[in-house]
UniProtKB/Swiss-Prot annotation:
GO terms for biological process: protein quality control for misfolded or incompletely synthesized proteins. This is ATP-dependent Clp protease proteolytic subunit. PANTHER family: ATP-DEPENDENT CLP PROTEASE PROTEOLYTIC SUBUNIT, CHLOROPLASTIC ATP-DEPENDENT CLP PROTEASE PROTEOLYTIC SUBUNIT 1. Keywords: Chloroplast, Hydrolase, Plastid, Protease, Serine protease. Its EC number is 3.4.21.92. GO terms for cellular component: chloroplast stroma; endopeptidase Clp complex.
């Protein structure tokens, strides 16, 4: 029997009694954000709204985005990436589980030197597929010219943020390239790999 989203106690400053809030609401108050599903317009808008709100609330404290995502739609993913670059606080990205496709694109968009992968995380990059856009009819449509422009956009970002040459990134994006956490670090997608059983990073 499903239990729904777990609730945790939270005491507002100046309040004597704690109230029960869902765990994500509580974590958001600590500036911890989660992308734990496919990237679509709904989760994209939620994360963008949270990043903007938390930036207005305090533009000096860093944000932390935990990613466990198989990817998803390109345009909503780019919207998350652009917001991460736009907001004043640094955005740490943390890969736990899988960051594939648009998940890896958002991962690489974290503040350089503040991108982390857990030891057993997996990262996958590839070129955008034609199912990035949902038409009103529910059918997926993409013009070849638009797909090429999107591929160029994603490739430029990977080149800029990984430090790899254009030919290396272009070659990698020809197919599904899966990486371990240490391989993703060597590839420049993350900067740090968490060390098990300690609070240190390598």
């Amino acid at each position: 029997m499903p239990i729904g989203v777990p609730k945790v106690p939270f005491r507002s400053p100046g309040e004597e009694d704690a109230i029960w809030v869902d765990v994500y609401n509580r974590l958001h108050r600590e500036r911890l954000l989660f992308l734990g599903q496919e990237v679509d317009s709904e989760i994209s808008n939620q994360l963008i709204g949270l990043m903007v709100y938390l930036s207005i609330e305090d533009d000096t404290r860093d944000l932390y985005l935990f990613i466990n995502s198989p990817g998803g739609w390109v345009i909503p993913g780019i919207a998350i990436y652009d917001t991460m670059q736009f907001v004043p606080p640094d955005v740490h990205t943390i890969c736990m589980g899988l960051a594939a496709s648009m998940g890896s694109f958002i991962l690489v968009g974290g503040e350089i030197t503040k991108r982390l992968a857990f030891p057993h995380a997996r990262v996958m990059i590839h070129q955008p597929a034609s199912s990035f856009y949902e038409a009103q009819t529910g059918e997926f449509i993409l013009e070849a010219e638009e797909l090429l422009k999107l591929r160029e956009t994603l490739t430029r970002v990977y080149v800029q943020r990984t430090g790899n040459p254009l030919w290396v990134v272009s070659e990698d994006m020809e197919r599904d390239v899966f990486m371990s956490a240490t391989e993703a670090q060597a590839h420049g997608i993350v900067d740090l790999v968490a060390v098990e059983n300690s609070g240190d990073f390598t």
